[in-house]
Amino acid sequence: MPPKDGKSAKKKGGISKAEKERLQREEEEKRQREAEEARLIAEREENERLERERIEQEKQHILELKDRERREDELNELRHILDENHFAVTVWEAECREKSKWERYMLCDGSPDPSVQPEINTYISLWRDDSENQIQKVLEECALTLELEKELEFLLGDGPEPSIAEQYQETLLSLQNLIHYKLNQATEELLKFANYNSDIDTGNMQTVVKDSNITLCLWANLNKNPRFKGYKFEEVGLGFELPKPLAVIEVAVRILHTRYDHLSHHSEREQLQKRRSMMEAILTQNTESSAAVHNGKMEGERDESESSKQVDECHSVRSESRKRSAVSVISAKEGRKSSSIKLLEEGESQMEEITTTLEADQHDPYPSPAEPVTDTDVHIVDLQQFTPLGGVFYFDLFHMPPQSRTVKGWEMRELLDTGLQVFPYPTEQSRIQSSTSVKLDEHSNTTVASLPVGVTVALPHSVLFLEDPQVARWDPIGQHWRTDCISETSYDAELRTISFQMTAFYAFTLLQETYANMPFQSWELRPLGQDSALFTITGALIEVSITVKGKQCMLHTEETKDLDRLLGKWMSPSELQKAMRKAGINIFVNEYSDKYVSINLKDPLIEHAVYEQMALMSSAVAFSWSRWNAQCRQEHLVLQACEQLEVGPVAEKAWSLYLLGAQRNQHLKMKEQEDSFSPELAEGSEFHSTFLHMLRQDLSTEGQARVRQSHHLYIDTVQRLLCATRVLTYS
């Protein structure tokens, strides 16, 4: 085949310029078409998004209008329900008080009525002058006196008039002092006859006398053996160790364990007085500053006075209706456009102002804590941070009273009117040497003050220590529990005993952190039937469950050891709280708690309103903790809820999330397990002004019937537990 010419070869070897331009044009046109298509798609998607948003906004607007239209009716209905329940509970409480007074009046057991001043004064005088000092008789009388104290504490809990309350407090203090006085007399009586009751093996006298309230361990040093180191009262798990100088002196050692605590309230009163002094100083400074502002005609005077007036008005409203619900305060004058409704409509600033005012009221169901006084002495125990448990151990050293001697068939005893005398310890070595025939090392400069005394204590069986207990001694001068002068502390968890040394003989107690079981890890309130529910809190250390049935509560916990007196017993909410705190199982908070526990700060008005409505629905609706609650700001709460009519655990898929606020409550589309939070409404759901109506719209007929038939005392009991634990803030 003949070869092609050069032109053909050139064409074959490359693309012509015209061809390149054509291809480029085609490529450019393709890019433009694709870009146009992408633009059109993006524009269409954007239009669709805007349309969806418009539709959503329209739906949102319609729902908001609908919510606004029925807002007044919903708030009024809720207020009416709460007021009815509150009135019924108030009437029942008044009837109970009257019934209790009548039963006390008709009681003919010979015991005085502690509320009647002449009766109780006569009782105190007669017992003080009674010469019967036998220990068993004294313990019996102490038991009666302790019952009278409980009556007085109950009366004080009713909030009597200030003058009456002061009278009750004085009577209470007199009874407490009288008990200790008579126990000292009984101790002296036992020591007078120590030589008759001496132990053959040791040559000393040791005895244990106890009842349900008091354990008295007494040891008298009759043998004065210099090799004596200490003694343990095995039957009660109490023991002591003495330094050698005391082993050769005629002294007596007493360990008096009272299962009640008559000392801590003195420290609480002292701390309260300091707080009041501090507040008075602050108020004085504020007054002086206000006066300076007034005299100087400073700008903003009118605004400040109006703000002060606003706060005073809010405080007045709260004081007059502190037992009513927060929602009642908000909605009581809805139709007259009151400041309570403006609180909901004018945003965060006013809510914070009201909250600040409410925090100052320490008698609220769960006010935010006031600033606790910080003492410069680090050894003083803060009784808000620590709780004395197991009662008080009085560890005392006494002079031995004169013992009887037999002379020519006659028993002779020196009678002294000094009573039981405390042996001063520590004291100078020379003083001890002068009172004994045993000489110590003359070259030693050691004083008895450097020789500590040892104590061993078995932990009380009625108390659950969640952590290793701490020890504090009582300072009678400063009226405080202190942690100094205590050393060599050793705790045996297996034997449940604690040993330590003190520089002197002090009353002491065992301490536990008040909020050791906080913050809560989770919680759940689940119905068990009509007017019955199970409230479970998983704390930082243990899980606690409380069964509610009517107006009664019963505690359950995994830790059952040594809590037989508490577990499985029905009692009122207030009795349960007191018993649980006394047993070391504290899940309750007060006005100082947030100073010691990491919390999710929430608006107290909103929080309290939610607790009220949860209590109303608790016969038919289960509630639970949500991790999203911590992610929301303080004006919003998030929790899980669902209808639960059967007894048993709630199915995981049954739970729904709810976002709650001061003005609006909504059912969320998202579930607890999702990775991110979304406020999108659940399909078919609407906004509601109250949580009650939000839940009620989805309830079955049976569920709604249960809610309507809920007894006011049951509702009050559940509400008290929720307000006392504040699970929405402390978990």
UniProtKB/Swiss-Prot annotation:
It is found in: Cell projection, Cilium; Cytoplasm. GO terms for molecular function: beta-tubulin binding; microtubule binding. Residues 17-50, 296-320 have a biased composition (Basic and acidic residues). The keyword Transmembrane does not apply. It holds the Pfam family Casc1_C. Residues 1-50, 285-320 are annotated as: Disordered. Part of the multisubunit axonemal dynein complex formed at least of two heavy chains and a number of intermediate and light chains. Belongs to the DNAI7 family. Via its association with the multisubunit axonemal dynein complex, may be potentially involved in the regulation of cilia function. This is Dynein axonemal intermediate chain 7. The lineage of its organism: Eukaryota, Metazoa, Chordata, Craniata, Vertebrata.
